[in-house]
Design a protein with these regions (language model features):
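Short, well-formed alpha-helical segments that are part of the catalytic scaffolds
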Residues: 11-26
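Short beta-strand/loop segment that forms part of the nucleotide-sugar
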Residues: 31-41, 62-64
């Protein structure tokens, strides 16, 4: 089972077309799947759009009355998968943004690498990706200064990118004996993606990568990325030693 996990806050303009594309891609891929969306206290029509699509694809919607934020949304989604997945050694969860900047077509590449033996598969943007906003380029350059060896020693080339596939057994081990009051991740945004990889990588035997396209031009709302807030969050992770004793193979 492929669980496509989508954190969504005020994504009514893109969540419908995203779900339609996921259904098309995974229907052709011919693997069982379920889309799990955390509707994070949206104030637009996101909930109404999700209700319409619940009749046309396997969809589970988790809801919070107030906005919890990206990290808490991802935590809830992954906990749901751990509790629902019938075959944790075979099933996987893929985290996909609700703003359509990540192409659902790339789900196939991630899952194929995982089926080849990897326990975590990280998306790696290709040179063919669309134009990158100036703020994203700036943070990408400055993040190396903010993170130092945490970035240099990472087991994947882009640990700030959250488009990844995780074998459920890895999630299960990470969440073991960890109540909901103790989330895996406390940062937000790009820092949350890095922190999540740091929490899960020690439980993986093999970590791989798959190419993907980033399509910032498809976002139908203003970017929520704030350069200095993101850099401050990344700088707080500079002293982490996630990779110091990591012993995983490449996939």
């Amino acid at each position: 089972m492929i669980y496509v996990c989508v954190p969504a806050h005020n994504e009514s303009r893109t969540i419908g077309v995203l779900l339609w594309k996921v259904r098309k891609v995974l229907g052709e891929f011919d693997r069982p799947y379920r889309v799990v969306v955390h509707e994070d206290g949206s104030t637009d029509d996101t909930a109404e759009v999700l209700a319409r699509y619940s009749r046309s694809l396997p969809l589970t919607v988790l809801r919070s009355d107030e906005q919890l934020g990206y990290a808490a949304s991802v935590d809830r989604l992954l906990r749901y998968v751990v509790n629902d997945a019938p075959y944790p050694k075979r099933d996987c969860a893929v985290v996909l943004q609700g703003d359509f900047t990540e192409d659902p077509q790339d789900l196939v590449g991630l899952v194929k690498v995982l089926e080849g033996g990897a326990d975590i598969v990280a998306g790696c943007a290709t040179d063919s990706s669309g134009p990158v906003p100036r703020s994203v380029r700036l943070i990408g350059r400055l993040s190396r200064l903010a993170l130092g060896k945490v970035l240099d020693d990472s087991p994947v080339s882009d640990p700030l990118n959250g488009f990844r596939a995780y074998r459920v057994i890895v999630l299960k081990k990470a969440f073991r004996d960890r109540p909901e009051s103790e989330p895996l991740v406390s940062s937000e945004g790009w820092a949350a993606n890095l922190e999540l990889l740091g929490a899960l990588a020690p439980h993986a035997r093999r970590i791989g990568e798959a190419p993907l396209d980033r399509r910032y031009e498809f976002r139908a709302r203003p970017s929520r990325l704030r350069a200095w807030r993101t850099l401050r969050a990344l700088a707080r992770l500079r002293g982490e030693s996630w990779w110091s004793e990591l012993d995983v193979g490449a996939a």
